[in-house]
Swiss-Prot record:
UniProt enzyme class: oxidoreductase
Site annotation Transition state stabilizer: residues: 63
Name of this protein: Peroxidase 50
Domain of life: Eukaryota
Alphabetical list of SUPFAM superfamilies matching this protein: Heme-dependent peroxidases (SSF48113)
Cofactor(s) the record lists: heme b; Ca(2+)
Residues involved in Ca(2+) 2 binding: 198, 249, 252, 257
Organism field: Arabidopsis thaliana
Length: 329
């Protein structure tokens, strides 16, 4: 049996903290100032063009970023395509609903960068996804903010690594807090990043349990607004095609704003994992605060996105810059 005294434990914790600090220490604004000075404008132009083609680009890119960062860090491992020898992250059951427009946004931005000689293969796919996510938030009416750059692309992507790392629609605050804490994110970060549900859509089958089969006592979740239940049942009848999706935010689905929190106050959170933010006493005060002050929410969202972008950063021999975002070099 190994005995760990307090001194050894303290040293272990300090070592862990130092490792985490070093992994994100290389991140900085204007990281590519010397190698590709116009990187952010090039990516922005590509993203803007993609958004003009389809609005789905916005929520798809935002969701792709979360799914990437929550599984072994922000390293573009979610971009990797499966091969005969490896089933990659993107083909895990929980990632199959990631819209293709998110992947295409990164691919198009990469192509735009590679068309500039001094930028070709100089910018990581992980950084491209980070910039693109910032840009889609802003293009949807959300805040503009500076992003830290300098990530390398991951060298591994397996479907087996995904399980248990992503939030589920039925999660309560305890489960959500635990998942976010594993990535160094606080309760406030969790509430702020959940605000991304002000954009996007979800498949009807994800809400069936709340409006048809809640529990043995009642078929409908009592925390759902009655008018919203009627609306959901009309949009999502029992026999609907499982590919059909509905807006996450029933009020302003194409606008990045704080209406998500106002919806929660009215019992109009689409998922259980949304509505519990209002019904749980630990998160309710923050929901109320941001529902009443959009600027405070925007600032909190920026801070939490920057923290999210530091999760699992790859450095040195743990990563590289991919020539193709969908395949290892």
């Amino acid at each position: 049996m190994v005995v760990v005294n307090k001194t050894n434990l303290l040293l272990l914790l300090l070592s862990l903290c130092l490792t985490l600090d070093l992994s994100s220490a290389q991140l900085r604004r204007n990281f590519y100032a010397g190698s590709c000075p116009n990187v952010e404008q090039i990516v922005r132009n590509a993203v803007q063009k993609k958004v003009q083609q389809t609005f789905t680009t916005i929520p798809a890119t935002l969701r792709l970023y979360f799914h990437d960062c929550f599984v072994n860090g922000c390293d573009a491992s979610v971009m990797i395509a499966s091969t005969n020898n490896n089933k990659a992250e993107k083909d895990h059951e929980e990632n199959l609903s990631l819209a293709g427009d998110g992947f295409d946004t990164v691919i198009k931005a990469k192509e735009a960068l590679d068309a500039v000689p001094n930028c070709r293969n100089k910018v990581s796919c992980a950084d491209i996804l980070t910039m693109a996510t910032r840009d889609v938030v802003n293009l949807a009416g959300g805040p503009q903010y500076d992003v830290e750059l300098g990530r390398l692309d991951g060298l591994s992507s397996t479907a087996a690594s995904v399980g248990g790392k992503l939030p589920h629609p039925t999660d309560d605050v305890n489960k959500l807090t635990s998942l976010f804490a594993k990535n160094g994110l606080s309760l406030n970060d969790m509430i702020a990043l959940s605000g991304a549900h002000t954009l996007g859509f979800a498949h009807c089958t994800k809400v069936f349990n709340r409006i048809y089969t809640f529990n043995k006592t009642t078929k409908v979740d009592p925390t759902v607004n009655k008018d919203y239940v009627t609306e959901l049942k009309a949009s999502c009848p029992r026999n609907i095609d499982p590919r059909v999706a509905i807006n996450m935010d029933p009020t302003t689905p194409r606008q990045f704003d704080n209406v998500y929190y106002k919806n929660l106050q009215q019992g109009k959170g689409l998922f259980t994992s949304d509505q519990v933010l209002f019904t749980d006493r630990r998160s309710k005060p923050t929901v109320d605060l941001w529902a009443n002050n959009g600027q405070l929410f925007n600032q909190a969202f920026i801070n939490s996105m920057i923290k999210l972008g530091r999760v699992g950063v790859k450095t040195g021999s743990n990563g590289n810059i991919r020539r193709d975002c969908g395949a290892f070099n």
